[in-house]
């Protein structure tokens, strides 16, 4: 908010109350769109000609080369590969990004591996590659263009808006919010990928993405730290039916802080440094893309706070189940039971980012108290995990240690576990320690696996435990 206000003061004031752009209607520069604390500057969005929004259609039949379609030229749709019996997913980029190639096309191609779909990449680069404040105002025109295309699909081709899914990253999240508002919430689904904070957070619902914009709105927050001083580009405000906050929503694993991120101006980010400066912000669309091919690896846990989630207070999933973050969030039966449902999960730091959550309880056995740490690995019918530290400190016989772990692979049905301990101290008496019982509980369904052993082992020697 503060950054938008500062930038606004540096620009000249534009007079007038509204500007009209033909079939898209008129756009006011008065409240709540402008003249607010978060948006003090009364400027207009650019014209459709200046923004030059393009709709690039990819389908299973043309996964590599787009077909440009236009709402003002319906024949471009009729003679394209657009299929009326398929769902249509629009993907909209954000600030200084583009709609051709890159992550948008990659997301389409992942969709083609799991479904027959019309995938439309929305390119509004000419409207996004300007000062941030102007780009934020331009989102209204881009949203209007999308809404008009959906209306043409409905009136000219009988295609229901309920079959439309709008996906938007950063400023693109508010673009699709505007489109949904103009379609009076009849769009089937909207997904906001780290909706942009500056010029939007705290504003009335008609200005930003909100749950009334679609029949179902899901949001992934990955950069929700305050814009000042942490340069968090994303909203912390909950704006969907389901609001996912992976890793707490502020700092993503694998995104390292750097000195540049503390001094760079949002209007000065250049394309080649996006991953360097905005790593957290970009994680949202990377998580979504990965979820398409890994539907079970992003299970979220409804919880009131990340602290409670980390304390395992929201584990396992309740009887009604847990929602999946990303592509399959709409499979959750309770998705629209209420708005602003808060969901937490942890992810990996690289690769496909997937994780599976378990609660592990270890009961120790041995002759005397030792100090050190204990590790446990899970072995299942789908593979085995790496070793995870369960406890570090005083290791007392009969003591029980509990910890939740986020496992790097889906091991499936757990068949055995392996225990290891170490204190990294040379001991001539070669003491032994073991696990008499290890209980593993799955977060998905609460199922418990119990493993037992009467053995003890020396440090750095694996102990295998089998079902009791």
Curated annotation (Swiss-Prot):
Q: Name one GO biological process term.
A: response to peptide hormone
Keyword Metal-binding assigned to the entry: answer is: yes
Say which domain of life the source belongs to.
Answer: Eukaryota
Q: Which residues are glycosylated?
A: 352, 427
List the catalytic activities from the record. Answer: a triacylglycerol + H2O = a diacylglycerol + a fatty acid + H(+); a 1,2-diacyl-3-O-(beta-D-galactosyl)-sn-glycerol + 2 H2O = 3-beta-D-galactosyl-sn-glycerol + 2 a fatty acid + 2 H(+); 1,2,3-tri-(9Z-octadecenoyl)-glycerol + H2O = di-(9Z)-octadecenoylglycerol + (9Z)-octadecenoate + H(+); di-(9Z)-octadecenoylglycerol + H2O = (9Z-octadecenoyl)-glycerol + (9Z)-octadecenoate + H(+)
**Induction (record text):** By NGF (at protein level).
A GO molecular-function descriptor:
monoacylglycerol lipase activity
What pH dependence does Swiss-Prot or TrEMBL list here? Optimum pH is 7-8 (lipase activity in the presence of bile salts) and 7.0-7.25 (lipase activity in the absence of bile salts).
Question: Which pairs of Cys residues are joined through disulfide bonds in the record?
Answer: 20-26, 108-119, 255-279, 303-314, 317-322, 452-468
Q: Where is the PLAT domain?
A: 356-468
Active site positions: 170 (nucleophile), 194 (charge relay system), 281 (charge relay system)
Indicate how activity is controlled. CLPS stimulates triacylglycerol lipase activity. Triacylglycerol lipase activity is not inhibited by increasing bile salt concentration.
This chain's protein is named: Pancreatic lipase-related protein 2
Gene (name only): Pnliprp2
């Amino acid at each position: 908010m503060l950054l938008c206000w500062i930038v606004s003061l540096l620009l000249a004031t534009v007079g007038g109350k509204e500007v009209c752009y033909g079939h898209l209607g008129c756009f006011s520069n008065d409240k709540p769109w402008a003249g607010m604390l978060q948006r003090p500057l009364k400027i207009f969005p650019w014209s459709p000609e200046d923004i030059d929004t393009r709709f690039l259609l990819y389908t299973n039949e043309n996964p590599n080369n787009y077909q440009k379609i236009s709402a003002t030229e319906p024949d471009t749709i009729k003679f394209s590969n657009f299929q009326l019996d398929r769902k249509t997913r629009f993907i909209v980029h954000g600030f200084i990004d583009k709609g051709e190639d890159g992550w948008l096309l990659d997301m389409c191609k992942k969709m083609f591996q799991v479904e027959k779909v019309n995938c439309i990449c929305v390119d509004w680069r000419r409207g996004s590659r300007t000062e941030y404040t102007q780009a934020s105002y331009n989102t209204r025109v881009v949203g209007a263009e999308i809404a008009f295309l959906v209306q043409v699909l409905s009136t000219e081709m009988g295609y229901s808006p309920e079959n439309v899914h709008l996906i938007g990253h950063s400023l693109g999240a508010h673009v699709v919010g505007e489109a949904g508002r103009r379609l009076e919430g009849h769009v089937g689904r909207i997904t906001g990928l780290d909706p942009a904070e500056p010029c939007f957070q705290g504003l009335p619902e008609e200005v930003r993405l909100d749950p009334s914009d679609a029949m179902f709105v899901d949001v992934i927050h990955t950069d929700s730290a305050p814009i000042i001083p942490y340069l968090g580009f994303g909203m912390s405000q909950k704006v969907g039916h389901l609001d996912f906050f992976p890793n707490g929503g502020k700092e993503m694993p694998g995104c390292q802080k750097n000195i540049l991120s503390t001094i760079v101006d949002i209007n000065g980010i250049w394309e080649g440094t996006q991953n360097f400066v905005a790593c957290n912000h970009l994680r949202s669309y990377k998580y979504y893309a990965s979820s398409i091919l890994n539907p079970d690896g992003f299970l979220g846990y409804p919880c009131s706070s990340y602290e409670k989630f980390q304390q395992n207070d929201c584990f396992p999933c309740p009887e009604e189940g847990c929602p999946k973050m990303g592509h399959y969030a709409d499979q959750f039966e309770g998705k629209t039971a209420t708005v602003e449902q808060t969901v937490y999960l942890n992810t990996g730091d690289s690769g496909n980012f997937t994780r599976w959550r378990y609660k592990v309880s270890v009961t120790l056995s041995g002759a005397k108290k030792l100090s050190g740490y204990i590790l446990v690995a899970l072995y299942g019918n789908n593979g085995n995990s790496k070793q995870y530290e369960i406890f570090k400190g005083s290791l007392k016989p009969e003591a029980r240690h509990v910890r939740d772990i986020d496992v790097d692979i889906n091991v499936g049905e757990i068949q055995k576990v392996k225990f290891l301990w170490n204190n990294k101290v040379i001991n001539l008496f070669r003491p032994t320690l073991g696990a008499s019982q290890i209980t593993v509980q799955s977060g998905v369904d609460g199922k418990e696996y119990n493993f037992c052993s009467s053995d003890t082992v020396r440090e750095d020697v694996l102990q295998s435990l089998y079902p009791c």
